Amino acid sequence: MIGGGPAGFMAAITAAERGVRAVLILEATPEVLTKVRISGGGRCNVTHACWDPMELVGHYPRGSKPLRGPFSQFACGDSIAWFDEHGLTLVEESDGRMFPQQNRSEAVVECLRRAALAAGVKIKCGSAVRHLNCSAAGDFQISDQRSAFYQAKRVLLASGGHPSGRRLAQDLGHTIVPPVPSLFS
């Protein structure tokens, strides 16, 4: 997993819980989940109480078509249930925003870290991936800024808004769609 933000954590935990034997999160910065800590003014707006995926996709600037599938497979209710199953209760505010019951973002960080630890996910901070190559056999070779080398059968890029993930994907031959901000409104 390249990226130690919430998407990287959710993907790593899910992979480990579904039986992937060795899951490693490589995070470029000294600490994982840093943006979660500051989101929502330190409270972390986890999701929004919008139960119909078709309604939810209408709130995103790219429109509904690209998001219909993902939001139908893992909707707001699924997110709420996931956190509840992992020990974090979310509460709805009058405007539909959902925050941790503790009303502090650190509760979300602690929940994700606990779930990762329980699932056997390993975390390596300060590991900015510089090169990602795919061999003819389909295995990946990964190296970071310290020349540490990793091999993997699968790689998931979850670098958030940082351009490094797009560059790595492009280096592998993927076509990149220019990103746009996508906050719920």
Map each language-model feature to its residues.
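N-terminal Rossmann-like FAD-binding beta1-loop-alpha1 element of flavoenzymes
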Residues: 1-25
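Cofactor-binding loop segments of dinucleotide-utilizing enzymes, especially the Rossmann-like FAD-
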Residues: 4, 28, 181
